[in-house]
Amino acid sequence: MTSQDRSEAVLVLADGRIFKGESFGAEGATLGEAVFTTAMSGYQETMTDPSYHRQIVVATAPQIGNTGWNDEDGESHGDKIWVAGLVIRDLSTAVSNWRAKRSLEDEMREQNIVGISGVDTRAIVRHLRNFGSVAAGIFSGEAAKQPHDELIEIVKSQPSMAGADLASEVSTQEAYVVEPDGEALYTVVAYDMGIKTNTPRNFSRRGIRTVVVPANTPAEDIAQYNPDGVFVSNGPGDPATADVMVGIVQEILAQKIPFFGICFGNQILGRALGMNTYKMKFGHRGINVPVLNHLTGKIDITAQNHGFALEGTALEQFDTPFGPAHVTHTCLNDDTVEGVALVNGLAYSVQYHPEAAAGPHDANPLFDQFVELIQANKK
């Protein structure tokens, strides 16, 4: 499809900013929170990450679509696209990857995902950095022909991400098992708050049988699996609404079951230990974010995707009903809390994504740390 064949599209922000471009993917209208990712690769993993539910993603990479779409890199069940919409500067007209099965645009049309191209993504990102993530909408085709004042009102009418309880919308409805690659050494119950498929895969490589359960599954219900450890995954929405999961994690900590959390799981553990959360101005979304481990002094380059964070400071220590706890990791860009743990080591979590997909593997040994924790707890 040539530029002349594409219909008009507009990106409308709730604060009144409007960016005109061209439609790609499905035609129509979509609403969500406008956020940006600085990742230069891995758009398929980004778009299928359930943590992006109800978000319109602005890509800072100047051209998107070069590697097409394959059947291997999706991070959700059925390769479902979770982003509400995609905003890009330039759509690649050629697909160049030996694994590609179809183009990005073909997949977006198949899954009815609305996109806009030909916009100044640098200007959009500067606006979001200056004024923060904001409610937005993409309108294309006939939908783009409505008066701009009406489109702005439509965008303003959508629910805020602050206070949004979204985990139940992306979580599995039934428990399922991911078997290890070889002999099962241990069993881990993983709470699916929006889990990425690469997480159970990392457990499998380490001899872990992973039982993935729906969000908010009562702690007493997971006893039937006789778990050697409990994991809480990444996911979308405001952690301040996750009171049920906070209570569940507190029960698990009281039972002294080894615990590991990623992203949303980090915020849940923090809240279970008495910390508070807040909505960030524009969040962290990219695959090159530096994080300092204050326990080792080492720096990891990490993959991140979060718009909420825990309140706290580097090396802060505090008392909890489960023993002393401390802040273990912070972001070198802005000092955001990136990890917390019980001092006894029985529970720990990080805000970033050691499973990557896409991104660097610096933090992948955190999965080994969990296996070692389980081993030590069995003795």
Curated annotation (Swiss-Prot):
InterPro entries: Anth_synth/Amidotransfase (IPR050472), CarbamoylP_synth_ssu (IPR006274), CarbamoylP_synth_ssu_N (IPR002474), CarbP_synth_ssu_N_sf (IPR036480), Class_I_gatase-like (IPR029062), CPSase_GATase1 (IPR035686), GATASE (IPR017926). The keyword Ligase applies. Residues 185-379 form the Glutamine amidotransferase type-1 domain. GO terms for biological process: 'de novo' pyrimidine nucleobase biosynthetic process; 'de novo' UMP biosynthetic process; glutamine metabolic process; L-arginine biosynthetic process. Signal peptide: none annotated. GO terms for molecular function: ATP binding; carbamoyl-phosphate synthase (glutamine-hydrolyzing) activity; glutaminase activity. The keyword Ligase applies. Pathway: Amino-acid biosynthesis; L-arginine biosynthesis; carbamoyl phosphate from bicarbonate: step 1/1; Pyrimidine metabolism; UMP biosynthesis via de novo pathway; (S)-dihydroorotate from bicarbonate: step 1/3. Pfam families: CPSase_sm_chain, GATase. L-glutamine binds at residues 51, 235, 237, 264, 267, 305, 307-308. The active site is at residues 263, 353, 355. Keywords: Amino-acid biosynthesis, Arginine biosynthesis, ATP-binding, Glutamine amidotransferase, Ligase, Nucleotide-binding, Pyrimidine biosynthesis. Residues 1-183 are annotated as: CPSase. It catalyses: hydrogencarbonate + L-glutamine + 2 ATP + H2O = carbamoyl phosphate + L-glutamate + 2 ADP + phosphate + 2 H(+). Its EC number is 6.3.5.5. Composed of two chains; the small (or glutamine) chain promotes the hydrolysis of glutamine to ammonia, which is used by the large (or ammonia) chain to synthesize carbamoyl phosphate. Tetramer of heterodimers (alpha,beta)4. Belongs to the CarA family. Small subunit of the glutamine-dependent carbamoyl phosphate synthetase (CPSase). CPSase catalyzes the formation of carbamoyl phosphate from the ammonia moiety of glutamine, carbonate, and phosphate donated by ATP, constituting the first step of 2 biosynthetic pathways, one leading to arginine and/or urea and the other to pyrimidine nucleotides. The small subunit (glutamine amidotransferase) binds and cleaves glutamine to supply the large subunit with the substrate ammonia. This is Carbamoyl phosphate synthase small chain. The lineage of its organism: Bacteria, Bacillati, Actinomycetota, Actinomycetes, Mycobacteriales.
